[in-house]
Design a protein with these regions (language model features):
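Short, solvent-exposed beta-strand-terminating loops
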Residues: 1-6, 47-55, 156-170
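Short, acidic/polar
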Residues: 27-37, 136-144, 195-198
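C-terminal helical cap(s) of enzyme catalytic domains, especially alpha/beta-barrels
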Residues: 222-243
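Acidic/histidine-rich catalytic cores of soluble enzymes
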Residues: 71-192, 241-245
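Hydrophobic residues within beta-strands of alpha/beta enzymes
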Residues: 47, 95, 154, 210-211
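Active-site acidic/histidine proton-transfer and metal-coordination neighborhood
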Residues: 5-125, 247
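A structural motif
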Residues: 39, 44, 151, 207-208
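A short, acidic, flexible beta-alpha connecting loop/helix-capping segment that sits on the rim
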Residues: 212-222
C-alpha cells in the first residue's frame, strides 16, 4: 500500500497487475479491507501487517533530504491507510505493524513519529519483533517497555551481531546466512536478544497475547530448529508473580 513501486513488488500481487504500480496499490488497499472483514468473520482480533514506506530510500539523508520530504512521506502513509483503518474499526479488528527495515517505522524514533502522525489512533499498534531492533543497536526490551501499550502481537525471533572489523551492519548485498555478514537471524536462544527481559516487561504489563515463533536461521536444520525454538519459548515464558516476596512480613 505505502511503498514506491519496484519490480519486486510484482511478486506480491496477481500476475496480471505486473508493472502497473497504481493498480497494484489499489489491489493492495482492497485486499487489506477484505482481510479486516474476513478477520471479523473468523473472530480474529489482530492482523499483523506492513504499511510500506514512500521514503525508505531517504533513510540515509543523502542526496540531501529536507524535513518537508520526510514529513510528506509520513503524511502519505496517513492518507493511504486512513480509509483502511476505518474498515478495521468498523469490523472491531486491530492492526499490528511489524517495526522493520523498509517500513515507515523501522526503529524507535520513526515508530514514535508514526504514532504521532496518526494521532495515536488505537487501530494501529505494534507487532514487536526484537530481532530487527537488536542489529540496529536498539535495546529490544527498552523499546518494548516504552511502547508496551501499543504492542498487540509479539514475534519471538533472535539475531546475532557478528561484526569482525570487516563486516558492517547494512548487509553488504550478501544473502542472509552468509558468515561474512555483520549480523544474521538465529534460532531462539542462539543470538543476542535477552528474552527474559522481554518476558518480564510483557508480564508486568499483563500481556496475554501470542508469542509467535518466527524462525529464520539459515545455518540450522529447520525441523530441529523449530522443535528447539518451541521448547525455548515454553521455558522462557514464565508466569508473573501474584504477590511480592516480602508480603509475609507486611505491616497490614
Amino acid at each position: 500500500v505505502g511503498d514506491n513501486w519496484d519490480p519486486r513488488l510484482d511478486n506480491f500481487a496477481p500476475n496480471e497487475l505486473s508493472g502497473q504500480p497504481e493498480k497494484i496499490r489499489q489491489w493492495a488497499i482492497e485486499f487489506m479491507k477484505t482481510t479486516a472483514r474476513a478477520a471479523q468473520l473468523l473472530g480474529v482480533k489482530v492482523v499483523t501487517c506492513f504499511l510500506g514506506s514512500p521514503i525508505w530510500a531517504m533513510w540515509y539523508s543523502f542526496p540531501q533530504t529536507t524535513p518537508e520530504m520526510v514529513e510528506a512521506g509520513f503524511q502519505k502513509i496517513r492518507e493511504l491507510w486512513t480509509p483502511i483503518f476505518d474498515v478495521y474499526d468498523e469490523c472491531g479488528v486491530r492492526l499490528a505493524l511489524e517495526v522493520h527495515p523498509t517500513e515507515i517505522a523501522f526503529d524507535y524514533w520513526s515508530t514514535k513519529r508514526l504514532l504521532e502522525t496518526l494521532d495515536y489512533r488505537p487501530t494501529l499498534g505494534i507487532n514487536f519483533d526484537p530481532s530487527h531492533l537488536l542489529w540496529q543497536g536498539v535495546t529490544p526490551h527498552l523499546f518494548l517497555q516504552d511502547f508496551i501499550d501499543r504492542v498487540y502481537h509479539v514475534h519471538m525471533k533472535d539475531a546475532a551481531v557478528t561484526l569482525d572489523g570487516r563486516s558492517g551492519l547494512l548487509g553488504s548485498h550478501i544473502d542472509f546466512g552468509d558468515l561474512r555478514r555483520g549480523w544474521n537471524f538465529r534460532s531462539l536462544g542462539h543470538g543476542g536478544v535477552d528474552f527474559e527481559e522481554i518476558i518480564r516487561v510483557l508480564n508486568a504489563a499483563g500481556y496475554d497475547g501470542p508469542l509467535s515463533v518466527e524462525w529464520e536461521d539459515s545455518g540450522m536444520d529447520r525441523v530441529e530448529g523449530a522443535t528447539e525454538a518451541a521448547a525455548f519459548v515454553r521455558k522462557v515464558d514464565f508466569k508473573p508473580s501474584t504477590f511480592k516476596f516480602d508480603d509475609a512480613i507486611s505491616n497490614k
